[in-house]
Amino acid sequence: MATRFSHQLFGAILVFLVLHPFAAKSATLKLESLQNLEHAQKGDVVNGVHQVKKFLKAFGYYPREINRLDDHFDDALEAGLAVFQQLYHLNVTALLDSNTIKAMATPRCGVPDVNINKTSNGGSNHRVFRIIADYSFFPGNPRWSMYQLTYSFLPDSVPVVSLQVLGPIIARAFQTWANVSPFRFRQVAQGTRSDIRIGFYRRSHGDGAPFDGPGGVLAHAFSPQDGRFHYDAEENWSSNPSGSQVDLESVAVHEIGHVLGLGHSQDRSAIMFPSFQVGTTKRNLGQDDINGLRALYRY
């Protein structure tokens, strides 16, 4: 079955699919809540399948047009699982196997990965925007019209980290992108009008993409020229992570990529890969990240 699925979907999903221009509404999954779903397959009705549909819908793998999320393992769920598995370099079985369940429960960015629409015949249509590279862009390829950008910290941000600590971390994250591009970033005073605005927020915070508390979605950002970049204030943030701590700088480099117009990448070594390993750092750009920004801005 895995081989058949891989061949059927190769042309549609080996390439990276399109991102929705806004951050996803939280629908993250806890590993313990998924254990009873292992080995579920199309046609089954299993308690908890609706949670998987909610997760896949939030991150673009299940049609937005389907509003009733039940426990029936349907065609759309099978197709969405196959796309998810392809993106995460898993064995494409279209089943809820253990590796797929673990991948779904891994902390990640809140920006959707793909965009799947329901077709007129009831199937799913995978919107493909590129064919070769692993990087991706937001729909319409939005970009900044200038390379000199300002950033500031939002005054209503939850005081998770002092600006004395956060300031140098964010400055280094911006410099990581400046080192490989024509972009130059300058911090301005808190509350001052700026191109990019950074803050920590809890749960629902007015942008249509509520956070989910500890674990799950760590942060999200919006496409150019919106400029919003939000951390989930309830995560265990650190500048030198260990154990269950999440690295502030690694997440910042990723979210700044979104602010500049990059979507998620299929390349696991890329900063723009959607999920994160807690207790570790990942602060350096991969070649795919660099190539993506060059392709978007054509410099």
Locations of regions flagged by a protein language model:
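Zinc-dependent metalloendopeptidases
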Residues: 2-299
